[in-house]
């Protein structure tokens, strides 16, 4: 039987933005889509618009010394699969991308549940990920920054605010209380890969599906853990407008360029 992640990997949308020279470092931006772990309407193509906006910025700015590419990553959805398949698919496909495209520096952009998966990819250290240790070591030594757009970070807090959201959580998890680890349990500034990680948290005032409660939760957690972060709260549109907003695109790429130039 073929590895199902092979198929998912070949569905990955690739946006090659700049190519400076063979000896340049390769900087990759990987987008992880949302959709509450269940929605087939959200795909790796969600970020095509923002890729175009980022491309415009790159064309007008100095990226000498870097090849820059963008990738939209895919993962299997519930109810066909349950946790931890979503995150292990993301790990597998990210690892393949890094190896196949020789990515030296990586930034992750996650929207909604994609932000959840991005945070897990970069920081989660639960026992169920032990067999992915070698892949995670490479991934985490390559990631320099996380852009978390209107994300979900605590299922317990989410269900307190939106009890009806159990309709999709129950499809994604057999028992979320046992299976979903709150980031307060694993975010630790003393871990080397977190020391070197830049956090960019973005949220829209106009988000009709998530209030600021999730963002506030993560912000307060990072403060308590003394982990530095950047926060942008503005009118970036409704929930599914955020990942196509041109101001968000500029925020992402200008922050990346400021780190490499």
Swiss-Prot record:
The active site is at 112 (nucleophile), 207, 239. One of its GO terms (biological process) is 'de novo' NAD biosynthetic process from L-tryptophan. Keywords: Hydrolase, Tryptophan catabolism. It is an enzyme of class 3 (hydrolase). Its EC number is 3.5.1.9. Coiled coil: none annotated. A motif (HGGXW) lies at residues 33-37. Catalyzes the hydrolysis of N-formyl-L-kynurenine to L-kynurenine, the second step in the kynurenine pathway of tryptophan degradation. Kynurenine may be further oxidized to nicotinic acid, NAD(H) and NADP(H). Required for elimination of toxic metabolites. Homodimer. The main chain amide nitrogen atoms of the second glycine and its adjacent residue in the HGGXW motif define the oxyanion hole, and stabilize the oxyanion that forms during the nucleophilic attack by the catalytic serine during substrate cleavage. This is Kynurenine formamidase. It comes from Vanderwaltozyma polyspora (strain ATCC 22028 / DSM 70294 / BCRC 21397 / CBS 2163 / NBRC 10782 / NRRL Y-8283 / UCD 57-17) (Kluyveromyces polysporus).
């Amino acid at each position: 039987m073929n590895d199902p992640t092979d198929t998912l990997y070949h569905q990955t949308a690739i946006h090659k933005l700049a190519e400076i020279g063979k000896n340049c470092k390769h900087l990759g931006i990987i987008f992880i889509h949302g959709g509450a772990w269940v929605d087939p309407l959200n795909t790796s193509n969600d970020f095509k618009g923002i890729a175009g906006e980022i491309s415009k910025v790159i064309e007008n700015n100095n990226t000498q010394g870097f090849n820059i590419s963008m990738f939209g990553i895919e993962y299997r959805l519930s109810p066909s699969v349950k946790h931890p398949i979503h995150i292990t698919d993301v790990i597998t496909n990210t690892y393949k991308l890094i190896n196949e495209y020789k990515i030296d520096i990586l930034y992750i952009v996650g929207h909604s549940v994609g932000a959840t998966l991005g945070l897990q990819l970069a920081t989660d250290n639960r026992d169920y990920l032990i067999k992915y240790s070698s892949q995670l070591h490479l991934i985490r030594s390559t990631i320099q920054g996380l852009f978390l757009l209107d994300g979900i970070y605590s299922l317990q807090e989410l269900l307190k605010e939106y009890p009806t959201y159990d309709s999709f959580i129950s499809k994604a998890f057999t028992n979320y209380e046992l299976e979903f680890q709150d980031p307060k349990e694993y975010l630790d500034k003393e871990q080397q890969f977190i020391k070197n990680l830049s956090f960019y948290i973005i949220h829209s005032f106009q988000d009709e599906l998530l209030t600021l409660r999730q963002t506030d939760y993560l912000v307060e957690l990072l403060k308590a853990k003394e982990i530095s972060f950047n926060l942008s709260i503005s009118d970036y549109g409704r929930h599914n407008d955020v990942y196509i907003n041109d101001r968000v695109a500029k925020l992402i790429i200008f922050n990346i360029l400021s780190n490499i130039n």
